[in-house]
């Protein structure tokens, strides 16, 4: 009987091999067509369709490689397994004779006779084929099945074969299922032994291990894998049979015919057998997991734990294993708290169960096999010079699998890494040994001569060595990827730690800045409390006038004759020959010095502190003004580049500025500033912005000339009498006409003196009124200015000698401002005279400050000057070539 089954098994393997070869050739031909299509689509530019074909090619390659290897080695593995089973049975019989206790853990497969006589799916395969031949709606006569067909538990030996044709048609399926039953898939004996191995943990604790038993356990695990595969094949065949029966039933129903009872019963039989096979598959998978756990404990466990390795793990034993892990609770408490993201990226340090370890191990092994297949396919495609896009896709898949392996390995504690790699290497060695055994027992190997066998063995050993090297390289690469990821995680943690420290340091820095900010206003007060007198820049209203922030209280320049405190400075740098010195001597001939006037400590402190604050404000304002001037210059330069064509036209149309245009020009300067050429041109309406720029440059040049002339006249006429503040100062004429200095008519003394009972607020109000009057007089028409100039020429200068004795001595003086007014009014002719010559030559020479006003830049202190309303209210007149070189300060008259 045994010889019959062996002869029967040789038939389907050849047919399966031929079928596999045909399917492989068909796949290869299909891949060639796919590659050709990909090239055509790429030439046409249809990249989306190319990607679809590439995915299809990739899936075909992945399916083709394992199919070819599996079909080539299937027959050899079956023969080797049969011989190994016989050897194992003999070894078990010898062990049973030596010791009364049997090794229940090893799943002894049934004998060949049991597998032949056991109920197997061959019956329903035969019946299924018979039904496929006879059961169809076109042939309503259904052949009655024999009792063996209705009874699935009938042995194969008792199944009658009615005709030779049916036996011939079902030979292949019968033989394939015989090979599956020989592995103990559906055998009741093998299932009973599996249940005994699961349900008898008390007997397993008595078993003593030996090297032969460890080999048997590894062999049994391999056998369990083969049994699982056979069971899966059986389930697949049962599902196919069910689908065929369903199609037959649907055909009957579609033709409104009654379904035969035999077909319905056969459907129920297939369904029940499918459920039974699925249950067997679950039992075999659980048995395989236990066997792998036992094998792992044999390789890893210490001698103290070997007595408990054969038992299935209970929850208590799992808890005991968790307590035996090297990591103690104290070590976990010593670790720093981490965020959930860091915990997800960092390797797990907590103990894991055996089931979790086995799952991770299976994942890594399966991904290693996929990586190996992909590398083989890459080598084949490279040798055949396939499409580089396909190669790139395979390489990307390998990289993704390696990263997935590293991520899976991170979930294991570090002490498990070496154990996992050793277990993987041991599994590879067992598979290679089994493969070598199968090859040596094959008929092809037996036919070879001893010399050929030696060469063949060397080739196999070389292949095995190469596989071992590849596995080690994969493991080393995996550890390198894991280490690189750990370094990246450490760097991220360090950066997060630094950011956390910086975040903690920010409140301290803010607190320090707040303290420094609080200490900064105290420093000027400490400087003011010292005995140093304030400098001229501190209390000089000149810089404040430029910034437009001058006020009587900030400057401390109020004075009166009713005992109010006055603040002065020691002007040690002023010489009697300087214009300021001469003005001081002439305004107060009885006074020898103006300096060293004592003041109270409170007023000195406030003046010094306010002076420093004003100085800081001046600097900030000057910086802002410079930036604004630069921006304005840039904007104007861009506009000038665009309007170069208009300049040529403006040269031809240039004419003298009339008095009305000049008055409008002055009003526009007062409103918009001297730098806003476009606004001034819109206001004047008869000139464009280029002509306005030329007029501004000419106007500023004339102002400088007039200033130089006034400085020279002040030095040459020391006998001039200073006018009282508040008198009209209007004059018309050119600088050439002002050879002798023109003096201003002083008002009668009764109008200038104020009663001593006036308060400082009343004095300030009167000064403001005078300033407004001066501002209104400054804007009078030109004919009124001419009349005042004629009256001013008829004035007798000898009457001024009586006035200084009646006036109170002012602490500071200013030169007469009539020349300044003459300079302003005389600029009209000079501007008109120089318009034609300086139309476009002086367009970029204007250094005027638009924020400080017209007369501030030129150092001419007229009441009502644009941009200096605060100075007008105070009544301070300033004169000098430059602000910082030669200033002169005068307080308002009484």
Swiss-Prot record:
Organism name: Dictyostelium discoideum (Social amoeba)
Protein name (Swiss-Prot/TrEMBL): Myb-like protein K
Stretches with biased composition (Polar residues): 140-149, 300-309
Gene3D superfamilies assigned: Homeodomain-like
Source domain of life: Eukaryota
Record field: compositional bias (Low complexity): 93-139, 150-221, 310-353, 492-527, 710-742, 751-805, 815-845
Major subcellular site: nucleus
Gene: mybK
InterPro entries: Homeodomain-like_sf (IPR009057), Myb_dom (IPR017930), Myb_dom_plants (IPR006447), SANT/Myb (IPR001005), SANT_dom (IPR017884)
């Amino acid at each position: 009987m045994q010889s019959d089954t062996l002869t029967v098994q040789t038939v389907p393997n050849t047919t399966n091999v031929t079928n596999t070869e045909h399917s492989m050739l068909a796949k290869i031909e299909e891949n060639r067509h796919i590659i050709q299509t990909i090239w055509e689509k790429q030439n046409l530019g249809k990249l989306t369709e190319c990607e679809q074909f590439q995915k299809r090619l990739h899936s075909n390659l992945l399916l083709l490689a394992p199919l070819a290897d599996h079909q080539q080695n299937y027959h050899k593995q079956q023969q080797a397994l049969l011989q190994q089973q016989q050897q194992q049975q003999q070894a078990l019989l010898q062990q049973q004779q030596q010791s009364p206790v049997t090794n229940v853990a090893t799943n002894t497969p049934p004998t060949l006779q049991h597998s032949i006589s056991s109920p197997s799916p061959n019956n329903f395969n035969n019946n299924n084929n018979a039904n496929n031949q006879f059961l169809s709606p076109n042939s309503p006569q259904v052949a009655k099945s024999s009792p063996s067909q209705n009874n699935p538990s009938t042995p194969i030996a008792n199944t009658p074969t009615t005709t030779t044709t049916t036996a011939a048609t079902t030979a292949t399926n019968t033989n394939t299922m015989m090979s599956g039953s020989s592995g103990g898939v559906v055998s009741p004996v093998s299932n009973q032994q599996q249940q005994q191995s699961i349900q008898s943990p008390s007997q397993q604790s008595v078993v003593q291990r030996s090297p032969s038993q460890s080999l048997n356990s590894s062999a049994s695990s391999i056998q369990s894998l083969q049994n699982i595969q056979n069971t899966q094949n059986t389930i697949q065949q049962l599902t196919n049979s069910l689908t065929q029966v369903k199609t037959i039933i649907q055909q009957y129903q579609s033709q409104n015919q009654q379904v035969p009872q035999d077909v319905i019963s056969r459907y129920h039989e297939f369904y029940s057998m499918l459920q039974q096979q699925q249950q067997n598959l679950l039992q075999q998978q659980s048995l395989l997991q236990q066997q792998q756990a036992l094998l792992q404990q044999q390789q890893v466990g210490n001698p103290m734990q070997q007595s408990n390795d054969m038992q299935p793990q209970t929850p208590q034993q799992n808890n005991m294993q968790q307590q035996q892990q090297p990591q103690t609770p104290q070590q976990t408490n010593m670790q720093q708290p981490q965020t959930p993201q860091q915990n997800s990226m960092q390797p797990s340090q907590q103990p894991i169960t055996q089931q979790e370890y086995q799952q991770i191990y299976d994942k890594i092994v399966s991904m290693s096999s996929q990586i190996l297949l992909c590398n083989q396919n890459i080598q084949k495609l490279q040798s055949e010079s396939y499409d580089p896009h396909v190669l790139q896709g395979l390489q990307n898949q390998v990289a993704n699998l390696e990263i997935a392996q590293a991520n899976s390995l991170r979930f294991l504690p570090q002490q498990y890494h070496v154990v996992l790699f050793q277990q993987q290497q041991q599994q590879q060695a067992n598979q290679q040994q089994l493969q070598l055994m199968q090859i040596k027992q094959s008929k092809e190997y037996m036919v070879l001569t001893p010399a050929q066998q030696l060469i063949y063995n060397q080739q196999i050993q070389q292949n095995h060595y190469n596989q071992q090297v590849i596995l080690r390289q994969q493991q080393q690469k995996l550890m390198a990827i894991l280490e690189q990821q750990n370094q990246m995680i450490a760097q991220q943690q360090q950066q997060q730690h630094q950011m956390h420290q910086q975040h903690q340091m920010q409140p301290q820095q803010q607190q320090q800045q707040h303290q420094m900010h609080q200490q900064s206003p105290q420093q000027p007060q400490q400087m003011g409390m010292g005995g140093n007198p304030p400098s001229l820049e501190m209390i000089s209203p000149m810089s404040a006038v430029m910034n437009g922030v001058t006020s009587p209280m900030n400057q401390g320049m109020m004075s009166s004759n009713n005992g109010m405190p006055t603040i002065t400075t020691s002007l040690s740098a002023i010489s009697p020959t300087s214009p300021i010195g001469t003005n001081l001597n002439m305004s107060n001939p009885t006074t020898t010095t103006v300096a060293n006037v004592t003041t109270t400590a409170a007023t000195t402190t406030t003046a010094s502190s306010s002076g420093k604050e004003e100085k800081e404000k001046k600097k900030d304002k000057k910086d802002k003004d410079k930036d604004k001037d630069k921006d304005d210059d840039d904007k104007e330069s861009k506009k000038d580049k665009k309007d170069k064509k208009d300049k040529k036209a403006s040269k031809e149309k240039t004419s003298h500025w009339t008095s009305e245009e000049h008055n409008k020009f002055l009003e526009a300067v007062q409103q918009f500033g001297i730098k806003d050429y476009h606004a001034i041109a819109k206001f004047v309406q008869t000139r464009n912005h280029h002509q306005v720029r030329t007029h501004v440059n000419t106007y500023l040049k004339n102002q400088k000339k007039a200033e130089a002339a006034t400085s020279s006249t002040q030095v040459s006429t020391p006998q001039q009498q200073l006018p009282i503040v508040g008198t009209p100062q209007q004059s018309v004429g050119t600088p050439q006409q002002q050879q002798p200095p023109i003096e201003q008519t002083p008002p009668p003394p009764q109008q200038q003196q104020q009663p001593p009972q006036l308060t400082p607020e009343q004095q300030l109000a009167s000064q403001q009124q005078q300033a407004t009057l001066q501002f209104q007089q400054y804007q009078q028409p030109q004919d009124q200015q001419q009349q005042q100039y004629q009256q001013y020429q008829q004035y007798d200068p000898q009457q001024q000698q009586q006035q200084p004795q009646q006036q109170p001595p002012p602490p500071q003086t200013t030169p007469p401002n009539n020349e300044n007014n003459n300079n302003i009014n005389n600029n009209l002719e000079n501007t008109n005279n120089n318009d034609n010559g300086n139309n476009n030559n002086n367009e970029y020479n204007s250094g005027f400050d638009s924020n400080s006003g017209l007369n501030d830049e030129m150092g001419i202190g007229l009441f009502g000057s644009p941009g200096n309303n605060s100075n007008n209210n105070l009544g301070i007149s300033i004169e000098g070539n430059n602000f910082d070189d030669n200033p002169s300060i005068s307080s308002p008259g009484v």
